[in-house]
């Protein structure tokens, strides 16, 4: 699958809000995003072809729930969260603090 990265080295490109939800990253067919009314603990939502997951970023990257993602998709989503964890957390603080 083609990968659409909106990240460049040390540069975050803020995408327009899609369906009222700030998108952080689109890659491997997965969209990583926040809802507008988020709450602690810090986490991201993942959408992959209408399948959904929620991944906590603190205290460490961990799965909160999964609704339909396959094991391989969950692994890729968790790995992506680990790679971009600091960027996602910084964006959380910019939006919700």
Model region roles, listed by residue range:
Residues 1-3:
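Cationic, amphipathic, low-complexity segments that mediate targeting or membrane/lipid association
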Residues 21, 28-30, 69, 73-78:
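Short, charged low-complexity linear motifs
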Residues 35-69:
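A short, structured beta-strand/loop element
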